[in-house]
Amino acid sequence: RRYQAAPVSMSAATKQQGEYVEYPNLIVNLTNYSVLYKGHSVDMPPKELELLYFLASSPNQVFTREQLLDHIWGYEYIGDTRTVDVHIKRLREKIRDDENWALSTVWGIGYKFEVRR
């Protein structure tokens, strides 16, 4: 299925605000585009980092693929909604679920950053 996102982009709105999110074993810093996982720096492309930051900024909130495309890729993205699935898969390969949090699939709906404690 192809999707054209509405003209809303998370990256333009938040990059300059100096924001970061922190959980046990995970720090995502949007200001300097860095991720620390279990004390180690993790390299990831900007869209993966923005996706992780966006999800982690709204813990336990479920987002559809379309909502994630709107916020991360913005209006210029014209393509398959499954690109979100690919980015989530790559994130999961780089940062494994923790006892305190997880990148969770909500079947039939989308994804969430689940805080377990």
Tell me the role of every PLM-derived stretch.
Residues 1-22:
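Basic, amphipathic DNA-recognition helix from helix-turn-helix-like DNA-binding domains
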Residues 1-5, 54, 93, 100:
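Regular, well-ordered alpha-helical segments
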Residues 63-67, 79, 83, 98-101, ...:
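Alpha-helix N-cap and coil->helix boundary residues
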Residues 45, 78, 85:
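Conserved catalytic core of two-component sensor histidine kinases
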Residues 21-49, 106, 112-117:
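A structural micro-motif at secondary-structure boundaries
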Residues 43, 86-88, 92-117:
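DNA-binding patch around the recognition helix
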Residues 34, 40-73, 91:
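Short amphipathic alpha-helical recognition elements used for nucleic-acid or partner binding
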